[in-house]
């Protein structure tokens, strides 16, 4: 049995962080956490680019363009959708999730999602590093691991049909 796994060593990886400006009190903390996680896993600061878009709904379009450049091994989407009094929360959350998943399926690189979908600002801040860890950092670490597993798959020897 051959096992292919990604490592959490990001040395030599090029990464992009795509961050929504809306709910910036939360998204800036996600960005700080993601950048710190990349650094801790060996990705050089000079190998990380940050792209900002207006809101979380716009993330998939920007992700698609960033991925299409072919310059990155790992791309991380960062945003926050906070429930309000209308069904807008459900629509945005669902469409962003579908959009990021679609980009990830078609990408030739690792694409991960650090988008919070929370019931309150307090809950979002907790998940952005105040109490419950930083989901931006988690998404960045997952991107490093995913980039490495994709590299391992690309290097795997071809098997002859029996």
Curated annotation (Swiss-Prot):
Any single biological process term in GO: riboflavin biosynthetic process
MF annotations from Gene Ontology: 6,7-dimethyl-8-ribityllumazine synthase activity
InterPro entries noted in UniProt: LS, LS/RS, LS/RS_sf
Assigned GO CC terms: cytosol; riboflavin synthase complex
Keyword Zinc part of the UniProt annotation: no
Listed pathway(s): Cofactor biosynthesis; riboflavin biosynthesis; riboflavin from 2-hydroxy-3-oxobutyl phosphate and 5-amino-6-(D-ribitylamino)uracil: step 1/2
EC number: 2.5.1.78
Active site: 88 (proton donor)
Coiled coil, from the record: none
Enzyme class: transferase
Residues that bind 5-amino-6-(D-ribitylamino)uracil: 22, 56-58, 80-82, 113
One Pfam entry name: DMRL_synthase
Positions of (2S)-2-hydroxy-3-oxobutyl phosphate binding: 85-86, 127
Catalysed transformations (reactions): (2S)-2-hydroxy-3-oxobutyl phosphate + 5-amino-6-(D-ribitylamino)uracil = 6,7-dimethyl-8-(1-D-ribityl)lumazine + phosphate + 2 H2O + H(+)
Keywords: Riboflavin biosynthesis, Transferase
Signal sequence coordinates: none
Function: Catalyzes the formation of 6,7-dimethyl-8-ribityllumazine by condensation of 5-amino-6-(D-ribitylamino)uracil with 3,4-dihydroxy-2-butanone 4-phosphate. This is the penultimate step in the biosynthesis of riboflavin.
Classification via PANTHER family: 6,7-DIMETHYL-8-RIBITYLLUMAZINE SYNTHASE, 6,7-DIMETHYL-8-RIBITYLLUMAZINE SYNTHASE DMRL SYNTHASE LUMAZINE SYNTHASE
Family that this chain belongs to: Belongs to the DMRL synthase family.
Name of protein: 6,7-dimethyl-8-ribityllumazine synthase
Organism: Anaeromyxobacter sp. (strain K)
Lineage, opening ranks: Bacteria, Pseudomonadati, Myxococcota, Myxococcia, Myxococcales
